[in-house]
Every structure is written in C-alpha cells, then in structure tokens.
C-alpha cells in the first residue's frame, strides 16, 4: 500500500489530486479485504486484535491495555466527484478519545492511549451485558461530562471495524434508539449522545444542517467543524483520506456550500487561498510539535515516573486540540466583540 502511495508523489500530482487517488486506492483495498473476510469468517472473540507500532520501550506498557487508536481525518482539499457517497458529521469542541466497555467496567482513553477515567455504563461489555466488548470513538465534553459518539469499532458481540461507515452509523443509531445511553442512572454514570450524520444524497438535509446556528442547543458545546465520512470506508486506527475535515468557514470555498453567517472566519483567512490556509495551519502545528518536543526533552532530563510519562503523553496526544484552542483564542481577539446578532456564550476550552 505504501509503495502505491509513494508512486503518486513521484508523479508530481498536487496534494488534492493525490488525495483523490489515495481515496480510490483505499476504497479498493478495503472492499477486497471485506470480501476476503467474508470468505473466511471468524467470530469476534477469535479475531486477533491489531497490535500498534511501539514508539519506544518505556511506553509499551500502556499500549497493551488499548490496542486501538482513534481514526484521524485529513483536510478535505477538493470537492469529491462522488459527493453523494459521503456523510457529514458535525463535531463538537472537546477531547477526542476511545471509550472501551469490557469485563464489567468502562474506561476512556486519550488519543495517545492513556486511560483518563473509568466508570460504570450500560454499554455492552459493562453492567449486565458483560459478553463481548464495546469500543466507541467519541468526543468528551468535560463541562457537560458527556461523551459525543462519532463512530464505533465494536458494539458488544458485533465487530463493525471492517464494516462500511454507512452500516456502522445505521447500527449505532439502532442501538441508541433501543437504549437510553444518554440518561444518567446507577448503571450508567455518564451520558453518551450519538452525533447526527447527514447524507449528501439529501441536499436539503445538509443545507439545513449547515445553516443551523447554534448547531447544539445554546451553543453548548461549541461546534468545532465538520467531518466527512465516505460511506464505503472501513474504520482504520490511523489517519485516513476517507475521513476528512473542514472548519465551518471553509465549507463554501471548498464545496460551494454556504453556512450560517455566524460562523466567522479568522481575519487572515482568504477565501481564494483556502489550501494555503490549510498549509499554514499545518506549519503552525509542526512548530507547536517542535515546542512540545523541546519541553518533553527537558522533562526527560528529570527523574521519570509513571505520572510524568502520563502527563507527557496527554500533552502529545492532544497537541492538535491545544493548537486549535490557541488559534481560536487568537481569532476571538482579532474579531473583538461578537456580532450581537450572532452572540454566543463564552466557549469552554478544548481539552
């Protein structure tokens, strides 16, 4: 797979065209893999879970507890030719994490694999339904103490990682309609809310979602941006071109779809140079990473203990959220007071 992608770079294709080609190649590979697995089906409990690449010996211990990582998106650098084959998911500001219900307990793990909370839930794998394992891809909003569910790797005895995104979303919707996972109870200590998805085959539904402001009641939580899932894509525990991302103010410039005027763009954003803005954002992110590495190097010179290591990993795993918060604060300062017609309450810092 890597060699075919390297060929795209050798051909000198622009980044947007490279993304198109990688999307087609991955869809082809995933479809073939699903067909092979159907021909040689194995129950979930007998499947070998993916083993992540170890970054270093000192961090291998915590990875044994969570052999998965969240699926990460790329910038959407072009309007897909098959836009009707994509789903739109509005994403709130919060802490990206994986929630695992297994062996009678539910645990939430940061992007770096560190457990930051454990509790009881009514998800399959916890409470009375301890058979199987549930792994949900979520955004945790601390102020509301709520997990907003994006996607799933497994749900009880049902393995869905290799299923198409359209089926995964359908399956989750059906399960959430059957159970009150968004209600606090003795056996469900935290709320789980399934995020809505909108099919580009229904332009009116997408248009309504883009013009809704605030998207979440009372703007709590804030809308961070929009995720785009290809309907036929499997869930992969890494960055993938089959899940893409745009900030609200980019929607019209990339897709030709206007959004509510209350979604303000930064002053340095130029609609005709949206790709350059993405590149500049990535450059700022790279600089932020270098700063983090320097800070971690200083920490490593001190005596290490598990708490120090955990703090390091949390900083690294949430580096994107940290940078986003800095840029958002910068943008708010540039804008000054919000337009009174679009007034919004102070937003919580992204975790």
Curated annotation (Swiss-Prot):
Residues 274-330 form a coiled coil. Residues 1-66, 294-322 are annotated as: Disordered. Residues 311-320 have a biased composition (Acidic residues). Its main location: nucleus. The keyword Protein biosynthesis does not apply. The keyword RNA-binding applies. InterPro entries: Snurportin-1 (IPR017336), Snurportin1_C (IPR047857). One of its GO terms (cellular component) is Cajal body. It is found in: Nucleus; Cytoplasm; Cytoplasm, U-body; Nucleus speckle. Residues 8-42, 294-310 have a biased composition (Basic and acidic residues). Keywords: Coiled coil, Cytoplasm, Nucleus, RNA-binding, Transport. One of its GO terms (biological process) is snRNA import into nucleus. GO terms for molecular function: U1 snRNA binding; U2 snRNA binding; U4 snRNA binding. Residues 52-62 have a biased composition (Basic residues). It comes from the Eukaryota. It holds the Pfam family SPN1_m3Gcap_bd. Belongs to the snurportin family. Functions as an U snRNP-specific nuclear import adapter. Involved in the trimethylguanosine (m3G)-cap-dependent nuclear import of U snRNPs. Binds specifically to the terminal m3G-cap U snRNAs. Interacts with components of the snRNP complex including SmB and Smn; these interactions are RNA-dependent. Interacts with importin-7 msk but not with importin subunit beta Fs(2)Ket; the interaction is RNA-dependent. This is Snurportin-1. It comes from Drosophila melanogaster. The lineage of its organism: Eukaryota, Metazoa, Ecdysozoa, Arthropoda, Hexapoda.
């Amino acid at each position: 797979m890597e060699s075919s992608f390297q060929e795209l770079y050798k051909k000198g294709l622009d980044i947007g065209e490279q993304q198109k080609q990688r999307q087609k190649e991955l869809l082809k590979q995933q479809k073939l893999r699903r067909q092979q697995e159907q021909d040689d089906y194995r129950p979930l409990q007998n499947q070998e879970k993916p083993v992540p690449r170890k970054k270093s010996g000192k961090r291998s211990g915590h990875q044994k507890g969570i052999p998965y990582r969240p699926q990460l998106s790329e910038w959407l650098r072009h309007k897909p030719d098959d836009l009707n084959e994509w789903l739109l998911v509005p994403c709130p500001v919060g802490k990206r994490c994986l929630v695992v219900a297994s062996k009678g307990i539910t645990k939430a793990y940061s992007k770096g694999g560190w457990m930051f909370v454990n509790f009881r839930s009514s998800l399959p794998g916890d409470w009375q339904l301890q058979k199987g394992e549930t792994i949900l891809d979520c955004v945790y909003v601390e102020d509301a103490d709520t997990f907003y569910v994006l996607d799933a790797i497994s749900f009880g005895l049902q393995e869905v990682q290799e299923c198409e995104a359209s089926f995964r979303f359908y399956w989750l919707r059906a399960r959430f309609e059957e159970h009150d996972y968004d209600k606090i109870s003795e056996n469900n200590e935290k709320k789980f809310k399934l995020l809505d998805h909108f099919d580009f085959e229904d332009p009116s539904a997408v248009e309504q979602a883009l013009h809704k402001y605030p998207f979440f009641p009372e703007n709590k939580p804030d809308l961070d941006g929009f995720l785009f899932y290809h309907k036929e894509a499997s869930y992969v525990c890494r960055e993938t071109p089959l899940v893409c991302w745009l900030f609200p103010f980019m929607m019209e410039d990339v897709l030709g779809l206007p959004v509510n005027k209350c979604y303000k763009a930064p002053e340095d954003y130029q609609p005709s140079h949206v790709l350059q803005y993405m590149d500049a954002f990535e450059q700022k992110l790279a600089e932020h990473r270098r700063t983090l590495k320097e800070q971690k190097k200083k920490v490593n010179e001190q005596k290490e203990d598990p708490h120090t290591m955990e703090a390091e990993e949390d900083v690294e795993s949430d580096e994107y959220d940290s940078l986003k918060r800095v840029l958002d604060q910068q943008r708010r300062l540039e804008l000054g007071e919000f337009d009174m017609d679009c007034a919004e309450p102070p937003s919580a810092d992204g975790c």
